[in-house]
Regions:
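A composition-driven surface/loop motif
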Residues: 1-168
Length: 168
């Protein structure tokens, strides 16, 4: 994974490009781990944590801001996202762990896919952010064609306000 490790000082900023991170080939590891701030302003970011521990696709000690880009984080833990984020985001905690090589699709109420990817590793918590996410729209996650039950953070969030509820 990517680790910036000067405690409470580091600022990891992603402004563009494509990052595909498959972390923790050993016993642990977050996808992207900033011991300060993590700011994503653009690009395509796919961050998968180690499947063996309590690691996150995106992890920051102080704050995570999602301001743009297409972002997918998969792991077994999730850090709180900043209310200063400028882009919608969703965090799903699934009822059971998604196996590696699972096809994940997130669809809106019209059946249009807003996310489609195959997991590199197993994980239970999925974070997703993209410019085409909308507030007050119900999204349905499916894994290998089966609609998933999820708990916990069932929300579309956006900086500057409380997250909107999602049906699940």
């Amino acid at each position: 994974g990517i680790n910036t490790n000067e405690d409470n000082v580091s600022v990891t900023t992603i402004n563009g490009g494509t990052l595909q991170i498959n972390a923790g080939l050993g016993a642990e590891g977050d996808g992207i781990d900033s011991n300060g701030y993590l700011v994503i302003n653009g690009g395509n970011v796919y961050a998968t944590a180690c499947e063996q521990g309590g690691d996150a696709g995106l992890d920051a000690t102080l704050d995570i801001q999602l301001n743009g880009g297409f972002v997918v984080g998969l792991g077994n833990m999730s850090d709180t996202l900043s209310t200063d984020s400028q882009q919608e985001y969703m965090v799903f905690t699934f009822a059971s762990t998604l196996p590696a090589e699972s096809e994940v699709v997130l669809s809106d109420t019209e059946g249009a896919s807003v996310l489609s990817f195959t997991t590199a590793k197993a994980g239970q918590i999925l974070l997703f952010s993209a410019p085409n996410l909308a507030r007050n729209v119900d999204y349905t996650p499916t894994v290998d064609g089966v609609t998933q039950q999820y708990t916990g953070n069932q929300a579309v969030g956006f900086g500057g306000g409380a997250p909107g509820e999602m049906d699940g």
